[in-house]
C-alpha cells in the first residue's frame, strides 16, 4: 500500500493507462488501414455495361465502363439464340453478323479480346450494323436484341474479378 492507502501507486495507474491507450491506438490504426484499403479498391472499381445503340444510320451494341477505374477483359462469351459461339475473337463478330443475316450490310465492330483494357468513361463499339431504308425498326430491333447475349469477365487494377451478363 502507498501512503494514501491505495493498492496501486500513481506510477502504476499511469503505466496501465498508457498500455490501454497504446492498445486502443493499435486497434484504431489497423481498422483505419483496413478501411483505407477498402476505399482505395472502390475508388478504382470498374463497372462494365452493355447498351443498345441506335441512331439514324446504325444500330448495335456498345460497351461502356461506367466505373471509376480501368477494366481489363479476361474472357468474353457471345451467345446467339442461347448457344455460345466458339472462339468469338475478331472474326467471331463477322460470324455473329452473318448469323443475324446482316452479312451484306456495312458493319463495324471493335476487337474486344482478352487483354483489352477499357479506361474509366470509355465507350467501345461491340457491333454496329447499318440501317437500310426499308427496315422496319419496330420489328427488327427487338428481334435482334432478343437473340444476342454476352458474358464479359473482367478484372480491376487489384485483380478483383467481375462478371457482367447481358441481358441481365
Model-derived features: where do they sit?
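Amphipathic, hydrophobic N-terminal targeting peptides for secretion and organelle import
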Residues: 1-2, 14
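Hydrophobic membrane-insertion alpha-helices, especially the h-region
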Residues: 15-29
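Membrane interfacial helix-start segments of signal peptides and signal-anchor transmembrane helices
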Residues: 8-16
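Amphipathic alpha-helical "stem/stalk" segments
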Residues: 2-5, 9, 31-168
Amino acid at each position: 500500500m502507498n501512503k494514501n492507502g491505495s493498492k496501486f501507486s500513481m506510477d502504476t495507474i499511469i503505466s496501465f493507462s498508457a498500455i490501454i491507450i497504446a492498445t486502443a491506438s493499435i486497434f484504431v490504426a489497423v481498422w483505419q488501414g483496413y478501411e483505407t484499403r477498402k476505399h482505395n479498391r472502390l475508388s478504382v472499381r470498374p463497372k462494365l455495361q452493355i447498351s443498345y445503340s441506335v441512331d439514324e444510320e446504325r444500330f448495335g451494341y456498345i460497351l461502356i465502363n461506367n466505373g471509376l477505374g480501368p477494366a481489363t477483359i479476361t474472357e468474353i462469351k457471345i451467345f446467339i439464340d442461347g448457344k455460345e459461339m466458339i472462339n468469338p475473337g475478331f472474326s467471331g463478330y463477322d460470324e455473329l453478323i452473318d448469323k443475324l443475316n446482316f452479312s451484306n450490310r456495312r458493319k463495324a465492330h471493335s476487337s474486344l479480346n482478352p487483354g483489352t483494357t477499357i479506361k474509366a468513361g470509355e465507350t467501345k463499339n461491340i457491333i454496329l450494323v447499318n440501317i437500310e431504308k426499308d427496315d422496319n425498326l419496330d420489328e427488327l430491333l427487338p428481334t435482334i436484341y432478343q437473340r444476342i447475349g454476352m458474358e464479359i469477365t473482367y478484372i480491376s487494377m487489384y485483380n478483383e474479378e467481375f462478371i457482367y451478363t447481358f441481358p441481365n
